[in-house]
From Swiss-Prot:
SUPFAM superfamilies: Aminoacid dehydrogenase-like, N-terminal domain, NAD(P)-binding Rossmann-fold domains. Pfam families: THF_DHG_CYH, THF_DHG_CYH_C. The gene is folD. Belongs to the tetrahydrofolate dehydrogenase/cyclohydrolase family. One of its GO terms (biological process) is L-histidine biosynthetic process. Pathway: One-carbon metabolism; tetrahydrofolate interconversion. The keyword Transmembrane helix does not apply. This is Bifunctional protein FolD. NADP(+) binds at residues 166-168, 191, 232. One of its GO terms (cellular component) is cytosol. Keywords: Amino-acid biosynthesis, Histidine biosynthesis, Hydrolase, Methionine biosynthesis, Multifunctional enzyme, NADP, One-carbon metabolism, Oxidoreductase, Purine biosynthesis. GO terms for molecular function: methenyltetrahydrofolate cyclohydrolase activity; methylenetetrahydrofolate dehydrogenase (NADP+) activity. It comes from Wolbachia sp. subsp. Brugia malayi (strain TRS). InterPro entries: Aminoacid_DH-like_N_sf, NAD(P)-bd_dom_sf, THF_DH/CycHdrlase, THF_DH/CycHdrlase_cat_dom, THF_DH/CycHdrlase_CS, THF_DH/CycHdrlase_NAD-bd_dom.
């Protein structure tokens, strides 16, 4: 019987537990987690993401503010704003909502965020810590959430064959390193890879994040595999817009041990782990043990 992984329910449980921990941190350590989100421009999809992040933060006791800046802001002005937040001791987490306008160097902006406040964990130093396998550090939210779902199904991943489809800095590459740290044998595939079906057919775990609707087919997946679909694709079906993943869900699910739907799979976990990262950042800044937050 295939497990349809309910990411929304799992994320809700994580946030409920986190809310209780935040109450303890406030009461016993005078830690009041604070997240600042910088949103440049007026991208409609980004507006939805930002609104959901702020709503979730406030619902569990994290102080949150979205700083909206015009899309014609100069790069140096944006960097000045980030440095202002870097120097604010009451701010624990800083998130720069991507994408940024074309005239702004996103890499430069991301690496301006203080390492200890980088709750997206995109700063080069946090990336280096992940690659080195350092514990008790900030890890990108989406792959961290995806790994949490995998380990709810299969607690011991040692020796498992895993395939990651997609090599982005946001999902694919960090997912590769997280699975490697679990002692998986990991293969990362991308747009130039050949024989994708052959690699996937040997995998115990498949994580896909390529942004291509119904890309992963039933014939690619072996019986009993765990399939984590990070893709979010907007398609028109019978005149209606619908969100679907990278996986041909209805066909693939029949072969899997467990699979995530889209929507309602990895997406809610991303927001949950952003909240967790914000609290971890606050604890690390205040020298309070945060090891039990790291899944």
């Amino acid at each position: 019987m295939t497990i349809i992984i309910d990411g929304k329910k799992i994320a809700s449980g994580l946030c409920e537990k986190l809310s209780q921990r935040i109450d303890v941190l406030k009461r016993e350590h005078s830690i009041f987690p604070c997240l600042k989100v910088i949103f440049v421009g007026n991208n409609p999809a980004s507006q939805v993401y930002v609104r959901n992040k702020q709503k979730k933060a406030e619902s569990i006791g994290i102080s949150s503010e979205t700083i909206v800046l015009p899309d014609n802001i100069l790069e140096n002005e944006l960097i000045e704003k980030i440095n202002e937040l870097n120097n604010d001791r009451f701010v624990n987490g800083i998130l720069v909502q991507l994408p940024l306008p074309n005239h702004i160097n996103a890499s430069k902006v991301i690496n301006t965020v203080s390492v200890e406040k980088d709750v997206d964990a995109f700063h080069r130093e946090n990336v280096g810590k992940l690659v080195k396998g350092e514990k008790n550090c900030l890890v990108p939210c989406t792959p961290k959430g995806a790994l949490h779902l995998i380990k709810l199904v299969e607690t011991n991943l040692s020796g498992k064959n895993a395939v990651v489809i997609g090599r982005s800095n946001i999902v694919g590459k960090p997912m590769f390193h997280l699975l490697l740290q679990e002692n998986c044998t990991v293969t990362i595939l991308h747009s130039q890879s050949k024989d994708l079906a052959e690699y996937c057919s040997k995998a115990d775990v498949v994580v896909t994040a390529v942004g291509k609707p119904n890309f992963v087919q039933e014939g690619w997946i072996k019986e009993g595999a765990i399939v984590i679909d990070v893709g979010i694709n907007s398609v028109s079906i019978e005149g209606k817009t619908k969100l679907i993943g990278d996986v041909d869900f209805d066909r693939v699910k029949e072969k899997t041990k467990a699979i995530t739907p889209v929507p309602g799979g990895v997406g809610p976990m991303t927001i949950a782990f952003l909240m967790i990262n914000t609290v971890i950042a606050a604890c690390l800044q205040k020298k309070v043990d945060a090891s039990d937050f790291v899944s």
